[in-house]
From Swiss-Prot:
Reactions mediated catalytically: an alkane-alpha,omega-diamine + acetyl-CoA = an N-acetylalkane-alpha,omega-diamine + CoA + H(+); spermine + acetyl-CoA = N(1)-acetylspermine + CoA + H(+)
Gene that encodes the chain: bltD
Catalytic residue positions: Y129
Its EC number(s): 2.3.1.57
Keyword Calcium: no
PROSITE patterns (UniProt xref): GNAT (PS51186)
Induction: Expression is strongly induced by spermine, but not by agmatine, putrescine or spermidine.
Descriptive protein name: Probable spermine N(1)-acetyltransferase
Lineage: Bacteria, Bacillati, Bacillota, Bacilli, Bacillales
Source organism: Bacillus subtilis subsp. natto (strain BEST195)
Summary of the function given for this chain in its UniProt record: Probably acetylates spermine to N(1)-acetylspermine.
Keyword list, A-Z: Acyltransferase, Transferase
Residues the entry annotates as binding acetyl-CoA: 82-84, 89-95, 122-131
Length: 152
């Protein structure tokens, strides 16, 4: 099983822009075009393509944001805008990619926690995150989405 997490570059940008979620997920996540524009405006975001067996199957953004809290004086590591392309959904790739992303972020940032935010009615995604140990912490992000955190 070959899983790769690759930065968005000129070489894969067109393919990244061609990734889409299914129709019923459109209200939960921005398009990759908007995501890449946001990453240009906020240098903390690191947009990546998610590859399985050489095929581009998904997208995510992550980063270390300088939010101070007692246990994480250097900031918070956030996983954001994670999705699997509609053509690859229903094949277990969400689980595989989330596991790989958690491991990648833990190694890259040497962090104690990973944060994400989610719409409270995105039940399928909430269940996935809960299976991987993410729990609601009672916070809301600046968009009013509920914050989940995973202790590493």
């Amino acid at each position: 099983m070959s899983i790769n997490i690759k930065a968005v570059t000129d070489d894969n940008r067109a393919a990244i822009l061609d990734l889409h979620v299914s129709q019923n997920q459109l209200s939960y996540i921005e398009s990759t075009k908007v995501c890449l524009e946001d990453a240009k405006e906020c240098h903390y975001y690191k947009p990546v393509g998610l590859y399985y067996e050489g095929d581009l199957v998904g997208f995510a953004m992550y980063g270390l944001f300088p939010e101070y809290d007692e246990d994480n004086k250097n900031g918070r590591v956030w996983l954001d805008r994670f999705f699997i392309d509609k053509h690859y959904q229903g094949k277990g790739l969400g689980k595989k990619m989330l596991k790989a992303l958690i491991q990648h972020l833990a190694e890259l940032y040497k962090c104690k926690r990973i944060y994400l935010s989610i719409f409270e009615n995105n039940i399928h995604a909430i269940r996935l995150y809960q299976r991987f140990g993410f729990q609601f912490n009672g916070e809301l992000d600046f968009n009013g989405e509920k914050v989940m955190v995973k202790e590493l």
